[in-house]
């Protein structure tokens, strides 16, 4: 079957089909040693030979048959080129060890999902160089993969079949593939988006691990559970901040957070939050804090992100700054946390390091100064730091003192921008509420049957306050549609 496998890459459809007919009576379909498929349909799919795949399906070849590697044709088309199998083929064909050029070319083929490189190697041209490999990659058309998967699915390929050894579905393999259309077609045809493998990894775990942003987005569209834990006790969020994936995965982390993944979920084995794992990366740490990551959570070894960071002196001072800024802000916003074990651990850690204590003192000093800037007997500029201040801001946003003190916020380097952002948000929402009130007034013109028009303005305002921004916008749009 080795000869047929090589033929799948190099020869005409007519020649291949004749060879299949010739070998049919002595077909070898199982071999626990070989890393290449031994079933003709599986070979054709692995060689990305569209014409032969179509011909074999028309002949009635079993689209859901598993080979000795436990793979169906659907698993194969969603996988990267068979690196180990190609090494086996070239070694057997040439009767020698692979050259460094061949080793590198095969790795290049797998990384770029490019079957053309395999074809080039099988031609056995001794004058080829790695530059030829890179040029070859530019010309590869992965739409062939898409055409093959559509063909397999049209002939009844089952998206739910799992490999016997690792319990992986085709979607697990597609989630590692740069061609996001493979995953999309599988989901259209009913693939289970949260199906676990033997390690309880979902397709989302695989997509995040391989930094496959397009597939991450598609999986989310089909309802992927981003809080699903694998057998190592980690979610896709934990994977996205890990050191192993330090490259090119900030955007994936942001996508997961925007979609509402649980930012403070702890791994089930060591109790790490994503924030614990992000102390090596200022960008990721800042993003997690922006989405509500709690720096006072203890892992199972009773360590907070800060207590872990101070033990490693190589971390940038900005890591300590961002964590302590947030710890102090949370203590101001939620005084009850001062009695929690995590906060006490952080304070012990901060007070034990002069550099950290000076940061904490600066935070508390700035908050105290903001509290001293009074807007009314009840409210100060520091109230704009609180999460539960929306009603307060709504009531006093037109206070002239706010505009006056707004320009002074640049002199508050730690929390000034938070205050300014809260003020801007409150003003935008106030204008939105006023616009919605006007639209409602215009829609419900004076009539004895309409009670809205005769309501006091303050009551109208309180009613509109209960609506979110999207509902307010829809109400304004409704005026122009009516």
Curated annotation (Swiss-Prot):
Highest taxon of source: Viruses
Residue pairs linked by disulfide bridges in the UniProt entry: none
Alphabetical UniProt keywords: ANK repeat, Repeat
InterPro entries referenced in this protein's UniProt entry, alphabetically: Ankyrin_rpt (IPR002110), Ankyrin_rpt-contain_sf (IPR036770), PRANC_domain (IPR018272)
Ranges: ANK repeats: 36-65, 69-100, 101-128, 129-161, 166-195, 199-228, 232-265, 270-297, 301-332
Stored PANTHER family: FYVE-TYPE DOMAIN-CONTAINING PROTEIN (PTHR24118:SF100), POTE ANKYRIN DOMAIN (PTHR24118)
Name of this protein: Putative ankyrin repeat protein FPV232
Organism: Fowlpox virus (strain NVSL) (FPV)
């Amino acid at each position: 079957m080795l000869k047929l496998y090589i033929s799948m890459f190099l020869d005409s459809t007519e020649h291949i089909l004749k060879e299949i007919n010739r070998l049919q009576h002595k077909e070898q379909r199982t071999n626990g040693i070989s890393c290449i498929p031994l079933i003709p349909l599986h070979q054709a799919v692995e060689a990305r030979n569209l014409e032969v795949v179509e011909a074999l399906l028309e002949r009635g070849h079993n689209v859901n048959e598993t080979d000795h590697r436990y793979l169906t044709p659907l698993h194969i088309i969603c996988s990267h080129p068979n690196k180990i199998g190609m090494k086996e083929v070239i070694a057997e064909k040439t009767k020698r060890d692979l050259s460094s050029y061949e080793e590198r070319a095969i790795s290049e083929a797998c990384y770029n999902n490019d079957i053309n490189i395999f074809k080039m190697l099988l031609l056995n041209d001794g004058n080829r160089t790695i530059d030829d490999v890179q040029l070859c990659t530019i010309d590869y058309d992965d739409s062939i993969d898409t055409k093959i998967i559509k063909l397999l699915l049209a002939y009844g390929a089952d998206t739910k079949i799992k490999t016997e050894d690792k319990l992986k579905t085709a979607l697990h393999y597609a989630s590692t593939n740069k061609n996001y259309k493979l995953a999309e077609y599988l989901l259209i045809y009913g693939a289970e988006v949260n199906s676990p493998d033997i390690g309880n990894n979902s397709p989302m775990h695989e997509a995040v691990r391989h930094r496959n942003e397009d597939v991450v987005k598609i999986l989310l569209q089909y309802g992927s559970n981003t809080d699903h834990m694998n057998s190592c006790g980690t979610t896709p969020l934990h994977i996205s901040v890990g050191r192993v994936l330090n490259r090119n995965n900030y955007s994936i982390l942001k996508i997961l957070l925007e979609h509402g993944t649980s930012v403070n979920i702890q791994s089930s084995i060591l109790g790490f939050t994503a924030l614990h794992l992000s102390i090596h990366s200022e960008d990721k740490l800042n993003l997690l804090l922006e989405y509500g990551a709690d720096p006072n959570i203890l892992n199972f070894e009773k360590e907070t992100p800060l207590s872990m960071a101070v033990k490693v002196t190589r971390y940038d001072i900005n890591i300590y700054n961002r964590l302590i800024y947030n710890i102090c802000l949370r203590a101001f916003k939620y005084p009850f946390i001062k009695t929690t074990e995590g906060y006490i651990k952080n304070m012990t850690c901060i007070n034990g390091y002069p550099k950290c204590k000076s940061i904490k003192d600066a935070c508390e000093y700035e908050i105290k100064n903001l509290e001293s800037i009074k807007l009314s007997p009840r409210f100060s500029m520091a109230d704009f730091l609180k999460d539960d201040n929306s009603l307060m801001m709504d009531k006093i946003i037109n206070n002239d003192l706010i505009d006056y003190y707004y320009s002074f916020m640049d002199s508050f380097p730690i929390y000034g921008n938070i205050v300014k952002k809260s003020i801007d948000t409150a003003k935008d929402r106030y204008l939105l509420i006023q616009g919605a009130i006007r639209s409602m007034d215009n829609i419900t013109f004076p009539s004895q049957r309409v009670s809205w028009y005769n309501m006091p303005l303050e009551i109208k305002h309180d009613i509109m306050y209960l609506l979110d921004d999207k509902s307010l916008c829809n109400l304004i749009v409704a005026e122009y549609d009516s």
